[in-house]
Amino acid sequence: NISNYFLGIVSANEGYTDDAYNYFKKVQSLKNRHSKFNIEFVRTLVLLEKFDHAFAFSKKVWTEDELFFEADLLLGLDSFIKKDYEKAEKYFERLNKISRYNFFFEDFIGNVLIAWSKASQGNKEDSLKFIEKVPNTYHHLTQTQSCFLKCYFNSEDTKKSFEKLIQNKDYNFSRYNFFLINYLTF
């Protein structure tokens, strides 16, 4: 019933997530025919913190030949949580492809997540390489991620890296004093 779909969209846009979910449940047959439905339904599930349902639904609708940011992100995170890093990286790499259509995230989210996947596998060199792949547009964020990776690996230059970050005159990184202090006290 098309009215349930539209009522679900309106409810989601108005912030009535429970109502949106109830309407979307009634039109599950759209999942194989309408990608916008899949996006809205996954977002609704996440907002309702129905993560297991969101993971399961994403697996059902995911295909190799269709880029679906929300599904790739969720399936990548699910694989990461389960320590299946190779599979997680497959999904995270797709985020870089998807982000080419959205210049705000181009090569950002996927590379940062892959860097942390590499870090979780103990691969310091590759994790830092993936952070370096992030476009210069995000240099403030890559600086912080680089510091956190160095902290994660307990690198010798971690303290120096945090100090350089905090002393940056172009941007106020003073809130990272907290991380430096915690790093130094442990």
Q: Which residues does each predicted region cover?
A:
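N-terminal leader/linker segments that initiate helical-solenoid repeat arrays
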Residues: 1-41, 47, 56
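Alpha-helical repeat scaffolds
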Residues: 21-25, 51-64, 86-99, 123-136, ...
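Residue-level signature for tetratricopeptide repeat
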Residues: 10, 44, 78, 117, ...
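Structural motif corresponding to the intra-repeat A-B loop/turn of tetratricopeptide repeats
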Residues: 14, 48, 82, 121, ...
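Alpha-helical protein-protein interaction modules
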Residues: 166, 177-178, 184-186
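Mid-chain, structured segments of secreted extracytoplasmic proteins
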Residues: 33-80
